[in-house]
C-alpha cells in the first residue's frame, strides 16, 4: 500500500512538473511575437506595465487647442509619454525629465491652402512613481509661465524655467518673428 501511494504521489508530482514546464516555455512578450494561448511570464508582464516612457499617440489639438483654424495631417503624433502602473495607489507615474521635439506637420487652412510647418511637442525622457500629493507640491513652487495662453509654454519642473513651444524657425517660415515673452509668432518690427 505504501508503495502504491508513493508511486501515485511521484506520478502526480511529475505530471505537475511537466504541465508547468510546458506552460513556462512562453516566449518573452514582444510586440507582435505573442502566440495565441501562450502564458506570459510574470516578470515580462511586470516590466512592460511598470511606469516608464512609452510611445503614445497624442492628438495635436490636445497640445494646441487654440489652433482651430487648421486641419493637421497627421492629426496625431507619436510621442514618448509617461505611462504604466505604480505599486501603490498613492503613487502616480510622472515625468522627471522632459524635452521638446520639433516635427514637420501639414497645416491645412480650408479654402486657403496648405503648407508643411514645424511644431514643437513635449516628450518625456524619464518617469518615476511619486506620491500624488507631492506632485502638486512640486508643481506649485514654480508658478505659471503666463496667466494667459499657458499652452504656448513648457516649464522645466526642476528649474522652473519657461520656454516656448513655438520655435523661431516655425515663425520665420510664416514670415514672422518669435516673441520670447509671449511665445507667439508676431509680425516683424520695422
UniProtKB/Swiss-Prot annotation:
**Which residues fall in a coiled-coil region?**
none
- Major localization class: secreted
For this UniProt entry, what's an example GO CC term? cytoplasm
The UniProt entry, under Gene3D superfamilies, shows: Cystine-knot cytokines, Vascular endothelial growth factor, heparin-binding domain
The record's comment on protein family reads: Belongs to the PDGF/VEGF growth factor family.
Indicate the quaternary assembly: Homodimer; disulfide-linked. Also found as heterodimer with PGF. Interacts with NRP1. Interacts with BSG. Interacts with CD82; this interaction inhibits VEGFA-mediated signaling pathway.
Instruction: Give the matching PANTHER family.
Output: VASCULAR ENDOTHELIAL GROWTH FACTOR, VASCULAR ENDOTHELIAL GROWTH FACTOR A, LONG FORM
Protein known as: Vascular endothelial growth factor A
Originating species = Sus scrofa
- Gene from which this protein is expressed: VEGFA
